[in-house]
Amino acid sequence: NVRVWVNGKMVGYSEDSKLEARFDLTKYVKDGENLIALEIFRWCDGSYLEDQDFWRLSGIARGVYVYTREKERIEDVNVMAGMDGNFTVNAKVTKGVKNVRVSVIDKNGNQVAYREASPVKGEVVLNGNVQNPSLWSAEIPSLYTLKVTASDKKDVVESTSIDFGFRTVEIKKGQLLVNGQPVLIKGADRHEMNADKGYVVSEEDMIR
């Protein structure tokens, strides 16, 4: 868990050792040089639960960075897509955004679906369909690109894209099905660990 400080003022607190945490520094920064400090705590509410089968280690295990965003922007995008080709896009935007457009692009760069709408209370929900989609599976992980563009009254303020797949995951009569086909999952209990750097693992460590 961590507290974030900027120029001697506390910005926020996060208590989760395995997920990212984001903090809005806007009202704490000033022109020129700023001091950003992270206060790391050794223990948290979940320490004893997390230590059932791996080492107790504390500290920052992944990257820390500062970035800027436009005042009017896309806050979040979520897409759900099933094997029938139907998809739903949920986009959250700031209040200055007046229009949201979404395009679905296939692997050949062709636009196979398009929708647009004006946000209501900072949110847009768009539904569409892609005819005969290439389905995602572990064996053939076919992906499409969702491009989301937000505009104010005149100009595009931000555009982002994410990759996604059409698939349906369900459990019927105790059997896990992906796109209607039974799937058997085998796994191993593995924790990210480097003998010298602890929880700080490189891409090479992950591949190995």
Predicted regions: what is each one?
Residues 1-76, 96:
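Accessory beta-strand-rich segments of carbohydrate-active enzymes
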Residues 1-6, 12-15, 46-48, 71-78, ...:
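Active-site-adjacent substrate/metal-binding segments within catalytic domains
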Residues 19-23, 122-128:
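Short strand-edge motifs at loop-to-beta-strand transitions and within beta-strands
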Residues 29-33, 130-143:
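Short glycine/proline/serine/threonine-rich loop/turn segments at secondary-structure transition edges
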Residues 40, 148-150:
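Conserved structural position at the C-terminal beta-strand
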Residues 60, 112-113, 157-161:
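Extracellular and select intracellular beta-sandwich modules with Ser/Thr-enriched
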Residues 80-85:
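Short, solvent-exposed loop/linker segments at the N-terminal edge
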Residues 86-118, 124-126:
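Beta-strand-rich binding/interaction modules
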